[in-house]
């Protein structure tokens, strides 16, 4: 995003349209590579995914996600359906070097998934996932329940995701919830990612409401957690639409 570029400066429409909420820079097309180069690139991608899954699932960092009572760490990432490129902006203020040149909460635009923008609008259910194996299945579950919780802001971020593959995932599962791309895996440490998927629930304003789900839950469990989130948010004064 703002590392290395500002998403708001160079915006091009994505080929499939853009959800309301993505990061920056022109897309440069490389010259065609030899056949074996393509296979090598594919193999590298497979290896990267396997390494990521191994890191997240078989060697957890001892974390259980962001603890209740703490605020969701700020981030802004490109949307999978957009055309903007760049690393996740995780800066908490301007000019923080590798974290970002612009504070993440200020990175706004139609091709940017900004967690601050989401929790300003209502309660949040955020899924972090790796696009491999059964991990992305939770996105279909969230999509299925979203109409029953109109005030909740559902979103997902793919760790080191591939845009073309994510677009196919969005299309195949009929997703309307925004899906972002964390191309360099910055959210792994920031969100204390311990499993795949990891689903975090937060009040309006970004304070985490309950412990994260660290595996794919049943639909009944997911519905119950969303119901609890809405009820707890109302108890704190939120006046969203009825579920």
Label the predicted regions.
Residues 122-173, 183-188, 239-243:
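Structural microenvironment flanking redox-active thiols in thiol-disulfide oxidoreductases
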Residues 70-72, 120-125, 154, 194:
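Extracytoplasmic
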Residues 121-122, 171-175, 183-233, 243:
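Thiol/disulfide oxidoreductase modules built on the thioredoxin-like
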Residues 84, 134, 163, 208, ...:
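Flexible, glycine-rich phosphate/dinucleotide-binding loops
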Residues 3, 50-62, 108, 141-148, ...:
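Short, surface-exposed patches at the edges or C-terminal ends of soluble domains, predominantly
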Residues 89-142:
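Short active-site neighborhood of thiol/selenol oxidoreductases, capturing the structured segment around
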Residues 1-96, 239-241:
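N-terminal targeting signals for export/organelle localization
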């Amino acid at each position: 995003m703002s590392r290395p570029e500002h998403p708001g400066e160079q915006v091009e429409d994505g080929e499939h349209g853009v959800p309301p909420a993505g990061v920056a820079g022109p897309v440069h097309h490389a010259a065609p590579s030899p056949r074996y180069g393509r296979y090598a690139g594919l193999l590298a991608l497979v290896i990267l995914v396997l390494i990521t899954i191994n890191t997240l699932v078989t060697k957890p960092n001892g974390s259980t996600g962001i603890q209740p009572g703490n605020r969701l760490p700020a981030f802004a990432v490109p949307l999978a359906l957009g055309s903007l490129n760049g690393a996740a902006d995780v800066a908490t203020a301007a000019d923080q070097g590798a974290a970002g040149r612009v504070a993440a909460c200020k990175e706004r635009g139609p091709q940017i998934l900004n967690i601050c923008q989401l929790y300003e609008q209502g309660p949040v259910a955020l899924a972090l996932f790796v696009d491999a194996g059964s991990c992305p299945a939770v996105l279909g579950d969230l999509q299925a329940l979203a109409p029953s919780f109109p005030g909740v802001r559902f979103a997902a971020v793919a760790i080191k995701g591939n845009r073309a593959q994510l677009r196919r995932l969005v299309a195949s599962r009929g997703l309307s919830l925004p899906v972002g791309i964390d191309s360099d895996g910055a959210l792994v440490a920031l969100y204390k990612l311990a499993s795949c998927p990891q689903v975090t629930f937060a009040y309006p304003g970004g304070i985490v409401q309950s412990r994260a789900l660290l595996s794919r839950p049943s639909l009944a469990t997911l519905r119950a957690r969303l119901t609890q989130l809405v009820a707890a948010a109302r108890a704190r004064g939120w006046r969203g639409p009825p579920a």
